Amino acid sequence: MIQVFIVDDSAVVRQVLTQILNKDPEIEIIGFASDPIFASEKLSSVWPDVFILDIEMPRMDGISFLKKIMSEKPTPVIICSSLAEKESETAVLAMKLGAVDIIEKPKVGLKNFLEESEILFIDSVRAASNARVKTHSFQNDDSKFLENHKQPKTDFSKIDTTDKLIAIGTSTGGTQALEFILTQLNIHCPGIVIVQHMPEKFTEAFANRLNQVCKIQVKEAKDGDRVQLGSAYIAPGNKHMEIYLSGAQFHIRVLDGPLVNRHRPSVDTLFHSVAKAAGKNAKGIIMTGMGNDGANGLLKMKQSGAHTIAQDEASCVVFGMPKEAILKGAVNTILPLSKIVGEVQYF
């Protein structure tokens, strides 16, 4: 039984989430509170397997409560937040602090959204219950070789086009894993294209924050972007991203379309396009996340001559996507996160 505690100042959210999650016989709501102060009082006698947490609440904000949870008893936390710009940035910070998922909460039509998103919430709770949220101490085996000598940030208008391409797909736990990798790269690394399952607007905030802490350039991808050395492009939320070859240059196509594996952006969509556009000049990496998105596309990349890598179980928050790719025969190499850094830098 997966025990869940809901902390949200909206009575509608607390009521409807309780109703839809209770439909799953494996999920039990053991408590809820309108703010973290009330939650703390109730948590003296019970402790859940998963928290669902709002960000903006009276008396104590969600980030402060998240820090309290992670310091006292690290537990999987799902952020359920609106898409206001300020909250988007805060939600990205929550992921850095250990939250395992973000679910977009609209400001209008909230009750209908919650009822229509029953499968989304149940799947998220199930995935979160399997997540490892203790602080990881990733010992980077390639650190001596990745000294970046405080090199200047990439200038998109001047840098050369990449002739190699790194494609990364990830979901639950991916924000921390991506930050671990990207912050250690220097501006001579190949161009990188990334699908991180994340709602619209959160991807922009995530890319902007990474850009502030990385030596390479990190941005939310735009339709028509030319993929360049020393740069990483994150697929925008609620859009698919594909790569195509124009002359000798890789370009990005951002497009609408139906959900693929219940996701938009989809890792499979990206990987299939990279297989076609780059072939053996690409490297595909599937990392921590729930579900099977990316497994078919990674197999197509492998068949096209690309080298394919899966993050190992020990360093994953959720060993779902890598496991599915391995079982499908799509993976050449299984590596801990600490070894993936060098695979990206030195391709």
UniProtKB/Swiss-Prot annotation:
Phosphorylated by CheA. Phosphorylation of the N-terminal regulatory domain activates the methylesterase activity. This is Protein-glutamate methylesterase/protein-glutamine glutaminase 3. InterPro entries: CheB-like, CheB_C, CheY-like_superfamily, Sig_transdc_resp-reg_Me-estase, Sig_transdc_resp-reg_receiver. Contains a C-terminal catalytic domain, and an N-terminal region which modulates catalytic activity. Belongs to the CheB family. It catalyses: [protein]-L-glutamate 5-O-methyl ester + H2O = L-glutamyl-[protein] + methanol + H(+); L-glutaminyl-[protein] + H2O = L-glutamyl-[protein] + NH4(+). It comes from the Bacteria.
